């Protein structure tokens, strides 16, 4: 089965530094067709193991090799494909005035708790839609500092229970998964 692994909060402003090439080498010892995309912790791999086993193994590798304890989120290729099949219409419009993201909620956390922590969105500045324990979140580029969620995603206690990727990043990850399937 093909999995997408999202590492939360790595290689940002020199913190939680993980060299993706080194991590890839470690992962290749245990998993097949390992691929990384960007330096922000996007990994594609194949395994017959469960999400739980993969999560535990990757957490161990990261702790042993890089001496870090970071949250990770794992989803299957089919789950990511389903997310894109249910993307909101406002994102499909590709409005250049908005920055489009997907917030992945790391289990056991859930949407209701995340929403309660982040609070109500700033109308006319941001838009959200929940789908299957992810949140599509877009905000106006000109007014992003006025966005309630933009301020709170990095500063509230919920920050370790979510990982955020741009729609474009995840679209490319999905494409890489598809390309790798044809090889």
Task: For each feature predicted by the language model, list its residue ranges.
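Surface-exposed, charge/polar-rich loops and edge strands
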Residues: 3-40, 44-183
């Amino acid at each position: 089965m093909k999995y997408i692994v999202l590492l939360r909060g790595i290689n940002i402003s020199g913190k939680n530094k993980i060299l993706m090439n080194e991590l890839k080498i470690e992962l290749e010892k245990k998993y097949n067709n390992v691929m990384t995309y960007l330096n922000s912790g996007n990994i594609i791999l194949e395994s017959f193991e469960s999400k739980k086993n993969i999560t535990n193994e990757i957490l161990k590798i990261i702790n042993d090799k890089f001496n870090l304890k970071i949250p990770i989120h794992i989803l299957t290729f089919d789950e990511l494909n389903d997310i894109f099949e249910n993307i909101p219409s406002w994102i499909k419009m590709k409005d250049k005035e908005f920055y489009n993201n997907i917030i992945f909620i790391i289990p056991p956390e859930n949407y209701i708790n995340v929403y309660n922590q982040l609070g109500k969105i700033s109308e006319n500045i941001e838009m959200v839609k929940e789908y299957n324990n992810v949140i599509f979140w877009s905000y106006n580029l000109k007014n992003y500092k006025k966005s309630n969620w933009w301020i709170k995603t990095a500063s509230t206690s919920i920050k370790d229970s979510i990982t955020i990727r741009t729609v474009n990043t995840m679209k490319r990850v999905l494409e890489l998964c598809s390309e790798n399937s044809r090889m």
